[in-house]
A protein has these predicted regions:
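N-terminal cap/lid segment of alpha/beta-hydrolase-fold proteins
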Residues: 1-27
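Active-site glycine-rich loops that stabilize anionic/oxyanionic intermediates
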Residues: 36-41, 116-117, 249-250
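Conserved alpha/beta-hydrolase
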Residues: 48-76
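Alpha/beta-hydrolase active-site loop
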Residues: 82-102
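Alpha/beta-hydrolase fold nucleophile elbow
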Residues: 105-116
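Alpha/beta-hydrolase-fold enzymes
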Residues: 122-208
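Short beta-strand/loop motif that positions the catalytic acidic residue
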Residues: 245-247
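Catalytic active-site module of serine/aspartate enzymes centered on a nucleophile-bearing elbow/loop
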Residues: 270-311
Length: 311
């Protein structure tokens, strides 16, 4: 049986603390997979995947990003990253967990999985710290139009001038998720997440999944997304790093696959060569709790096995 170890770690932001877990295999550890979770959720939602992989010799670790899960001081911290540069803080914290994990489990192949917002941070991470990885899985990602992201970022800055960076703007939130539930109206506002209605209801009943982002977090996230439109930044990614993109072909974040393919093409244009992708018919955004989640778990494990066979 694998075992979970909860841990805390000082954030790279003074005075803040990160909460995380490690799921340690009972037998020999073959590799490490670090997780970067999505927007308005928390790392413990990934425990089923962690157990599945740990039973196959993969140690899985991850933490709650700032403003998420247990990485808060009070509930007022929900949806707030950091000032003056929240995007940098989230990236630096991801790397701090990498450093800690490599100190505890040295000389092992090391992989990163990022979902949704966490996928955008994972893609930035690959450009800054990619040489510390043996591969990465990019899940539930997209490719937002540069002009729209710039407008959204400017709107955040204007609103913050009047209300401050802790302000929670319903306008920005509405614009960010506009159209995601199109064609699914009538039951909940979040059926775009998943075909499994019980999982959607569970998500909506969870306090850690229903807060509104602050202007600070939106501005930080938009800043990071804009970096992914910069060819010079993407060119910093190791060209031979193995990547696996996973997406539901009914995921609105990835524009039903079109945005995911644009993200892949942007990396190919930057010279990245080793990219695979899987699109799941009918699946929506949250693949790890979708109706075909065991298929997704198996594909992740199989891809990791393939990479380890090359080591």
């Amino acid at each position: 049986m694998s075992r979970f170890i909860d841990f805390t770690l000082p954030s790279t932001v003074p005075g803040r603390t990160l909460h995380g877990f490690r799921c340690v295999p009972e037998g020999p550890v073959r590799a490490v997979l670090q997780l970067s979770h999505g927007m308005v959720e928390y790392i413990d939602r990934y425990r089923p995947l962690a157990e599945y992989l740990a039973d196959r010799g993969i140690l899985v670790t991850g933490h709650d990003h700032l403003g998420h899960g247990a990485s808060i001081r009070t509930k007022e911290d929900y949806g707030y990253f950091a000032e003056p540069d929240g995007n940098r803080a989230v990236l630096a914290d991801l790397h701090a967990v990498t450093v800690l994990t490599k100190e505890l489990y040295p000389n092992l192949p090391y992989f990163l999985l990022g979902h949704s917002m966490g996928s955008f941070y994972a893609r930035q991470y690959l450009c800054e710290y990619g040489r510390e990885l043996n591969g990465a899985i990019i899940m539930g990602t997209g490719f937002q139009p540069k002009a729209l992201v710039k407008i959204a970022k400017t709107l955040c800055r204007v609103l913050a001038a009047f209300h401050g960076w802790h302000y929670r703007s319903n306008l920005v939130a509405s614009l960010s998720f506009m159209g995601y539930n199109k064609g699914l109206e009538g039951r909940t506002t979040h059926d775009w997440l998943n075909r499994d209605q019980a999982e959607v209801d569970k998500y909506l009943a969870e306090e850690r999944c229903t807060f509104t982002f602050t202007l600070n977090a939106y501005y930080s996230m938009f800043s990071g997304i804009l970096r992914l439109h910069d060819p010079a930044f993407l060119a910093r990614m190791p060209k031979d790093l193995p990547l696996l993109f996973l997406s539901g072909d009914a995921d609105p974040v990835g524009e039903q696959g079109k945005g995911v393919r644009r993200a892949i093409q942007s990396l190919k244009d930057a010279g990245v060569q080793n990219i695979e992708s899987i699109f799941y018919p009918g699946a929506r955004h949250e693949l790890l709790v979708e109706t075909n989640k065991l298929e997704v778990f198996g594909d992740i494990a199989a891809w990791l096995d393939k990479q380890l066979a090359k080591q």
